[in-house]
């Protein structure tokens, strides 16, 4: 290949490999042509929002004029192209800006793009979407002040404007509040993983909602404006492990109330009920015992368990290490839910041997 393309060969190989990686992450943005014509850098692809998440955000911005002030390679603009009245983009990096222009042209989209620093706004009445850099040299930044730009200066600069800021899912909600943010925090999950926490300024927030969980796999959303009258009782027939977006958004009680479930412990995210709500994955309780490895091994052996999905909350147990120690030799796939119940001197660890619903 080097004989044919010379010094360009490494760049061609890298572009080909990046396009293959991008197909699963961004393919939905361009269903007709795919991403086979797009340009990337490795870091830009890592930072790019997955297509389903970008499209979800675009639906919330339908009918608006939107300015993606950190447009990078054009992912959000591609998602907005059929929903926003107008979408414009800017970025401080001229290379990524050129890539965005190329990528959007591959979709037949003539985008309004310019080079600009996000801290120096170039639009007035548009909704501004901002994705501060959370990686540097492949390493993640976890503190809000370490974002580039930092979240505090961003919120100060756009105070009073309609703004959407993408953040890491593990952000400290209280710290965000101390920065003066008064809108909605939306936690988004996709394919079973929590992808991001998105800040929606007050003018864009749902009515009365400060926290929202959006589960893209099922299309379900729940907010803190819903009832949270979820009781605490011993396990019923089923145990439900709520989606990570629900847990991260602090909406376990609201989720339980919606689905007619209760908590096993007020500080633990597991829910339970005597019937499994439609479309939810659950674990049918077969046996319940005080956690003891030897006793657990005996119970699993008696149930012919050969593979165990192990879920743990509230106690320092490594599921993979425990699975190896159990030495299961049966033929039946089961699940073990291990959790702390109670607090202080009254707390105890309970194991539930279950049959997964799917």
Swiss-Prot record:
GO molecular function: methyltransferase activity
Top-level division of the source organism's lineage: Bacteria
Coiled coil segments of this chain: none
UniProt-listed GO biological process terms: methylation
Keywords: Methyltransferase, S-adenosyl-L-methionine, Transferase
The enzyme's E.C. designation: 2.1.1.-
Disulfide bond positions: none
Family as reported in the entry's similarity comment: Belongs to the methyltransferase superfamily.
Cited PANTHER family: S-ADENOSYLMETHIONINE-DEPENDENT METHYLTRANSFERASE RELATED (PTHR14741), TRIMETHYLGUANOSINE SYNTHASE (PTHR14741:SF32)
Protein name: Uncharacterized S-adenosylmethionine-dependent methyltransferase MT3122
Species annotation: Mycobacterium tuberculosis (strain CDC 1551 / Oshkosh)
Lineage, opening ranks: Bacteria, Bacillati, Actinomycetota, Actinomycetes, Mycobacteriales
């Amino acid at each position: 290949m080097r004989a044919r393309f010379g010094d360009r060969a490494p760049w061609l190989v890298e572009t080909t490999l990046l396009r293959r990686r991008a197909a699963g992450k961004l393919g939905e943005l361009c269903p007709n042509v795919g991403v086979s014509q797009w340009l990337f850098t490795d870091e830009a692809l890592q930072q790019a929002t997955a297509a389903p998440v970008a499209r979800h955000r675009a639906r919330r911005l339908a009918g608006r004029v939107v300015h993606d002030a950190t447009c990078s390679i054009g992912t959000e603009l591609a998602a907005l192209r059929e929903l926003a009245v107008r979408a414009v983009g800017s970025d401080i990096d001229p290379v990524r800006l050129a890539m965005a222009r190329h990528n959007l042209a591959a979709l037949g989209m003539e985008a309004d793009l310019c080079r600009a620093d996000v801290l120096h706004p170039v639009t007035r009445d548009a909704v501004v979407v901002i994705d501060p850099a959370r990686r540097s040299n492949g390493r993640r930044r976890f503190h809000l002040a370490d974002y580039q730009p930092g979240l505090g200066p961003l919120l100060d600069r756009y105070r009073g404007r309609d703004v959407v800021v993408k953040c890491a899912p593990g952000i400290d909600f209280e710290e965000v509040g101390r920065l003066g943010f008064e809108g909605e925090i939306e936690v988004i999950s996709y394919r079973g993983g929590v992808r991001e926490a998105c800040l929606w300024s007050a003018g864009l927030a749902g009515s009365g909602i400060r926290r929202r969980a959006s589960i893209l796999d099922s299309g379900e959303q729940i907010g803190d404006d819903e009832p949270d009258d979820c009781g605490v009782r011993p396990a019923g027939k089923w145990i439900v492990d709520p989606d990570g977006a629900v847990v991260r958004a602090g909406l376990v009680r609201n989720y339980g109330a919606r689905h007619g479930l209760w908590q096993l412990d007020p500080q633990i995210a597991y829910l339970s009920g005597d019937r499994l709500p439609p479309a939810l994955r659950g674990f049918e309780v077969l046996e319940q015992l005080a956690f003891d490895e030897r006793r657990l091994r005996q119970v699993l052996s008696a149930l012919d368990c050969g593979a165990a999905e192990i879920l743990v909350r509230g106690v320092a147990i490594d599921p993979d290490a425990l699975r190896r120690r159990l030495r299961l030799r049966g033929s039946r796939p089961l699940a073990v839910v291990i959790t702390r119940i109670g607090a202080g001197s009254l707390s105890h660890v309970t194991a539930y041997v279950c049959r997964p619903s799917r």
